[in-house]
Amino acid sequence: MSFCLTELYLWSLKNNLHIGDEDVGVHQYHEKKEAALHPDYGFLEEKQQWMESRGFPWILKNKRPEKLRDNLTELEELMQSSECVLSKWKNKYVCQLLFGSGVLVSISLSGPQLEKVVIDRSLVGKLISNPISDAIFTDSFIILSFLKENKLCLIQFTKKINSPDINRQLDKLSLLDLKISYTDIPGPKGRHLVRHLAINSMQDLALCWWPVPVDDVKPWSPVSSEKDRANLVLLSNSSCKLEVLSYIRTEGDLLNACFSINQPYQICTVEHSLNSNKEPMADRFIYECVRNKIQCVSVTRVPLRSRVISCAVNTSEDKLVLGCEDSSLILYESDCKVTLLAQADLLPDLIRWHPNGTIFVVASSQGELQIFDMALSPIRAQILAEEIEPNSTIQVCKQFNVSSTLVEMHWAAPHTLLQNMDMTDIYNLLYLRFDGGPIGVLQLKLGAICRGQLGAMEIISQYIRHDEVDEAVGLLSSMNWNTMGHQCFTSMTAIVNHLLRQRLTPDREAQLEASLGTFYSPTRPLLDTIVLQYRDPISRYARRFFHHLLRYQRFEKAFLLAVDIGARDLFMDIHYLALDKGELALAKVARKKAEEIDAESINSGVEPLLPTDTLADVNEAFVDLSLIPQVEDRILGSFPSTDLGAHNSIQRNANRQLVHIENEIGIEVYAESLDKSLPWNQECFEEDFAEENPEGIGSLKVVHFGLV
């Protein structure tokens, strides 16, 4: 059973969290002589020694000029007295927190541990309106929105810091010579609205949006206007000022709005609406900025069973996850128009995709977490403990005493670099913020085998390692060959090799078909370059599957696969094996099919795949297949009985997932390439046959294309 091991690091000095001394996977900072304050905890000293032996501080130092312990205490007091409106990762080592009062806190990390905390009050008292609703931080400016005012504030830095030194990036704003300006925006006046902000990757367009209030002014009201009813505002950021370009009123209730990562002048929104039958829907709108106007380009409507409360889009923007009030999760794949449904074990208040787009985390406001892969298969996890007890959810709230709700969750990765992210870098920290504190990170312990990565290949390898083949095949089916060709091929070969090493059962047969079907019968059309690059090596795995079927006398499925491959030698293999087993009708049909392929080759001027002499040698090499051990006969009895002549068309269509491959994608089979010993298959073949025939008695030799 595969599962993910985690550790929870809370950046807190409070002694009322009541973290147990036996909870080896939950950590916080402590005061000196704290053991005397908790006489019931008899293992605090041992836990301290264990933490310090791993290089993690138990007691924070308070040396000047950092004064880390004092600054952390001040940060915790600030979280109690003021609302944190934004948590943004400048890079994977620096997190910035902005409070409604204008206080900016920068946190520098070393792994999951605090290294430096800088509290900046440069903006306090310099803004005309409080409190702050949302903010955008860049290296050259800041944009602020407010709860009580229809205004946006632009703060420009006349001095820039381009130093890669993290300590220089934590300098206070007062050193950057701030220039502050304001811009009025449309929207209802005199309303307290949480106005959200977004900016495109070019940083020349900004977006301000807010959900429609419950008691909103009706469209037929004489006091309302289009400007007052707007809830989506597009602004330009040029010439050192913000300027309103366009504004609209969305059709549904806005759940999220942002600029596309890949298309900087496209706006993507997710809206909640009702259809004509008053049933809930989730609408995904794509808007474009054309001549400084917002124009709708496309609309995708996803029917739901209950109201949507959260959503998230992956970095490649082809998968949208929706969380609903009934704890259901809907995954919509835009490129192949497929919708998947799963049931979460918690209320999905927050959803966050991992930067590489393979997994996402769902969280409830009570502090429960659940991990899913992009095929909606749940990944079990647990916080480090003495006993191995993985569960479907991580109960963070039960690890310490906290009465507040989980309000924010992010991966420790900068949003601006997601489109150019280095996939070899490690992103294993999940930032958690509870209302009023504490804050901290959940670290995923991925181990040396996965190299700290959370990619599709690493997760599939873990699935295979624990014999969870259905989950591995499901994840492979969700991968895109056109953009992840190497990962798809590596994952597919790993699954197929794993299955071919084992005895054939109905489940494994279906898994082999599904794995090869991701290439031969894809849900989305494959690019010609992908087909040309991978068709030859994958056709060899299809041949191995054919002989695996033949080995277990799955004549019908082997015949259908031979039709798809279109090779004469495969039909001759069926012919001689059927003769040996007394299946004269099948032998006759297979021989006839081989002769048809021969005739087509002669008419088209193409030489047969194998010379006649070679075929004669192969035929003489066959031995009596009655020597196969009786245990395999018992396995064959578990398969449904098939009759090639009486097989109905419905069953044939259901079983043929690899139909007309040669006609559809132009696969050509060359005997000279297949006769060669393949370096990546030779080991697998030797291991397979050594495993199945340890004594070498009463079994067959490898005489032709892996046939036993």
UniProtKB/Swiss-Prot annotation:
Transmembrane segments: none annotated. InterPro entries: Frtz, WD40_repeat_dom_sf. GO terms for cellular component: axonemal basal plate; axoneme; plasma membrane. GO terms for biological process: cilium assembly; cilium organization; establishment of protein localization; mediolateral intercalation; nervous system development; regulation of embryonic cell shape; regulation of protein localization; septin cytoskeleton organization. Keywords: Cell membrane, Cell projection, Cilium, Cilium biogenesis/degradation, Cytoplasm, Cytoskeleton, Membrane, Repeat, WD repeat. It is found in: Cell membrane; Cytoplasm, Cytoskeleton, Cilium axoneme; Cytoplasm, Cytoskeleton, Cilium basal body. Pfam families: Frtz (PF11768). The keyword Transport does not apply. WD repeats lie at residues 303-342, 343-382. It comes from the Eukaryota. Interacts with sept2-a. Interacts with intu and fuz; fuz, intu and wdpcp probably form the core CPLANE (ciliogenesis and planar polarity effectors) complex. Probable effector of the planar cell polarity signaling pathway which regulates the septin cytoskeleton in both ciliogenesis and collective cell movements including covergent extension during gastrulation. Controls cell shape but not polarization during convergent extension. Proposed to function as core component of the CPLANE (ciliogenesis and planar polarity effectors) complex involved in the recruitment of peripheral IFT-A proteins to basal bodies. Belongs to the WD repeat fritz family. This is WD repeat-containing and planar cell polarity effector protein fritz homolog.
